[in-house]
Amino acid sequence: MAAEDPATRRVQVAEHPRLLKLKEMFNSKFGSTPKFYVRAPGRVNIIGEHIDYCGYSVIPMAVEQDMLIAVEPVKTHTLQLANTDPLYPDFSTTANNICIDKTKPLWHNYFLCGFKGIQEHFGLSKLPGMNCLVDGNIPPSSGLSSSSALVCCAGLVTLTVLGLRLSKVELAEICAKSERYIGTEGGGMDQSISFLAEEGTAKLIEFSPLRATNVKLPSGAVFVIANSCMEMNKAATSHFNVRVMECRLAAKVLAKHKGLQWDNVLRLEEVQSKLGISLEEMLLVTEDALHPEPYSREEICRCLGISLERLRTQILTPNTQDELTFKLYQRAKHVYSEAARVLQFKQVCEDAPDNAVQLLGELMNQSHRSCRDMYECSCPELDQLVDICRKFGAKGSRLTGAGWGGCTVSLVPADMLSSFLASVHEAYYQGNTSRLAQEKHSLFATKPGGGALVFREV
């Protein structure tokens, strides 16, 4: 049952090499022993890209890679953070005065998001300090949600230190909201799957209210992650937040066109819901109401009957106020068609026809085309990698995560896995020194993993 608390598992640390190594490093760093450990997984989104923040369902699964944190509560009010990776410097601050710097999304700020989210949810003014050592094996900026996994892990760490309880759903909602402290206007998928994931199954994640339903993936095929080795730091770029705003503006213009009260409309799903029509019908409305040419700020103002000042101060966010044009038609087309593909994907998984793998693969291919052409969130390296994956046997391949770099996910018949991995290695990684150096963490088959939990030593 997804509404329960995150699990607590009692373990013999000596029997788990990664926990044991983390315990030893913690002792070396802080001169003491961790009281507990928390892990939160990364995720791969199988289908449903850039639609969670528009109100639509998505189908992700947790990967086996995760963020793992060793924790010791301390009597002082000092929060001390360290990382097993020397690339990420130590950080220390007072637990009662958390400041998150949006301008520089340094690693510790993601921890602070989760910490502050719990603090604000309970309205706490004084929090205990803690020593934390973080160990992550999710490739950063790869589209596998390493940053959200750290936010979720920090939220559960803080909750556990305080001795308080929340359900997985509540934690997911708090962490989704608190990640926005760093300036990323995400929709909640990453945090939801990190908490609600169950081993062996993907999940249909629905929003408002948040709920997760099992999606049984077909036997005889596996999902393979391949990293393009092009990093995209979501919070450090305006691409992502501009797309969020384009979807919001498209929703408002569509609502106005259909005679709806548009002022409070924020998501494309709200327009469909208010009109009470199907996704296919929403695509026809989009064709009728919006044009493919980019909209200037002045044209948007004319469509909505508002002043440029009102658009700038009441609708545009600080990080989109300098944009001169917005592609409303393309973004709405992607969102409504992708939302329909998610439902079709789930239906194929439920019906389990003989050609299920073929059908699911085609939906993934359609998704990538839409991400590339309508949402414009791909890049040449991702497109090349998708083509290579299809050439060597993937029934479907698409970018996963925000895009503009990061990973692809491919649906590969199980009996072709070995030859597929060897061929993709040769075609994409071999011969490129920087890609080859990262390949160990860049090309792997994965299966649905479990969600966030707490480890306590026996």
Swiss-Prot record:
Keywords: ATP-binding, Kinase, Nucleotide-binding, Transferase. The keyword ATP-binding applies. One of its GO terms (molecular function) is ATP binding. The keyword Nucleotide-binding applies. The record marks R43 as: Transition state stabilizer. One of its GO terms (cellular component) is cytoplasm. InterPro entries: Galactokinase, Galactokinase_CS, GalKase_N, GHMP_kinase_C_dom, GHMP_kinase_C_sf, GHMP_kinase_N_dom, GHMP_knse_ATP-bd_CS, Mevalonate/galactokinase. Pfam families: GalKase_gal_bdg, GHMP_kinases_C, GHMP_kinases_N. It catalyses: N-acetyl-alpha-D-galactosamine + ATP = N-acetyl-alpha-D-galactosamine 1-phosphate + ADP + H(+). The active site is at D190 (proton acceptor). Gene3D superfamilies: 1.20.1440.340, 3.30.230.10, 3.30.70.3170. One of its GO terms (biological process) is galactose metabolic process. Its EC number is 2.7.1.157. Acts on GalNAc. Also acts as a galactokinase when galactose is present at high concentrations. Monomer. This is N-acetylgalactosamine kinase. It comes from Mus musculus.
